[in-house]
Amino acid sequence: MFHDSAHAAARFGLSDAGNIYGRLTNSTQDVLEKRIAALEGGVAALAVASGAAAIAYTIEALAQAGDHIVAQKTIYGGTYNLLENTLTRQGIQTTFVNVHDIQEVEDAVQEQTKAIYLETLGNPCLLYTSPS
């Protein structure tokens, strides 16, 4: 809630820190993020609305044009599409591998590889993958 139009203008002008709009800043989400960070011993946390958003944010934070990702072949279709199509258009290449074959994973790693992505219970096949 804004006290007056000057207060609203200051918030939207970013000269006064605080909540502006629920999609940009949200006091409930802020409390959750701070508590998760404290529980995990971290500096900060980010809560997003879906697993797909979390995956996209993480990969885009780690990789940029010219970089590479190694990913499990049997992953959720939306994630496969992100890696195979969306990120390819941004210049991030992905090699899909059988993560149960460690040699195949190792062979896929390149100098530009920024992450190895796997799902411990890969959708749609429900194959269990141990990250160890």
Q: For each predicted feature, which ranges?
A:
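Conserved N-terminal alpha-helix of the aminotransferase class I/II PLP-enzyme fold
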Residues: D4-A56, G78-N85
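Glycine- and other small-residue-rich loops at beta-strand/loop junctions that grip anionic moieties
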Residues: Y21-G22, A47-V48, Q72-K73, T94-V97, ...
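CheY-like receiver
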Residues: R35, T58, E104-A108
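Buried hydrophobic positions in well-ordered alpha/beta secondary-structure cores of metabolic enzymes
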Residues: I36, A54, I69, I116-E119
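Short, surface-exposed connector motifs at secondary-structure boundaries
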Residues: L39-G42, A63-H68, T88, K114-A115
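Conserved PLP-anchoring active-site segment centered on the Schiff-base-forming lysine
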Residues: A61-T79, V97-N98
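PLP-dependent aminotransferase-class I/II
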Residues: N81-L126
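Conserved small/polar residues in nucleotide/adenosyl-binding loops
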Residues: Y128-S132
